[in-house]
């Protein structure tokens, strides 16, 4: 199993993003190799937040995808059909708390620690993400979407 980070989901949905094809290629490669891409509820919450924020950079935009709630909901349905959604387990909170205390995690990085805690609760050690730097301090294997080569390259 490999967890898909929220940024992979977001880029898969945004054809205008230069990394859209990279994200889709990585996920298709995982599926073709019978690897099991999985998602956790936090990824859906974060996707909804980004997807339904106003597109564009501040001050006019909010760094979002500019989707309507119906569009974001359709994508969530697609993700649920395509990937395995692993529910949060009871041990998530104590695992998260241990990580943030032991590694000295503060601020917004505590959300990254929660993803890692969810991974640990399922014995998952690989994360597909465009934000490798956010996860370097955690005891996981970071997989870059760009590591999946395009056919013919």
Locate predicted features.
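Acidic, PIN/NYN-like endoribonuclease modules and their adjacent C-terminal/linker elements
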Residues: 1, 113-153
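Short helix-capping/linker segments at secondary-structure and domain boundaries
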Residues: 18, 55-59, 123-127
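Glycine-rich, phosphate-binding/catalytic loops in enzymes
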Residues: 20-22, 144-145
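Metal-dependent nucleic-acid phosphoesterase active-site entry motif
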Residues: 1-20
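Hydrophobic (often cysteine-bearing) scaffold residues that line and stabilize catalytic clefts
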Residues: 19, 111-112
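Short, locally clustered residues in the helix-turn-helix/winged-helix DNA-binding domain
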Residues: 13-14, 52, 120
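PIN-domain endoribonuclease scaffold, especially VapC-family toxins
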Residues: 2, 24-38, 42-108, 117, ...
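Alpha-helix/helix-capping structural signal
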Residues: 7-8, 42, 114, 133
């Amino acid at each position: 199993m490999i967890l898909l980070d929220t940024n992979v989901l977001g880029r898969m949905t945004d054809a205008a993003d230069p990394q859209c094809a990279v994200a889709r290629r990585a996920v298709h490669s995982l599926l073709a190799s019978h690897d099991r891409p999985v998602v956790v509820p936090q990824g859906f919450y974060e996707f909804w937040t980004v997807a339904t924020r106003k597109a564009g950079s501040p001050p006019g935009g909010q760094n979002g995808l500019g989707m309507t709630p119906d569009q974001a909901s359709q994508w969530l349905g697609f993700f649920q059909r395509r990937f395995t959604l692993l529910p949060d387990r009871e041990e998530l909170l104590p695992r998260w708390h241990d990580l943030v205390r032991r590694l000295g995690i503060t601020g917004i990085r505590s959300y990254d620690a929660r993803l890692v805690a969810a991974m640990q609760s399922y014995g998952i050690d690989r994360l597909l993400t465009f934000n490798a730097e956010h996860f370097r301090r955690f005891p996981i294997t970071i997989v870059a979407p760009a590591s999946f080569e395009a056919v013919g390259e």
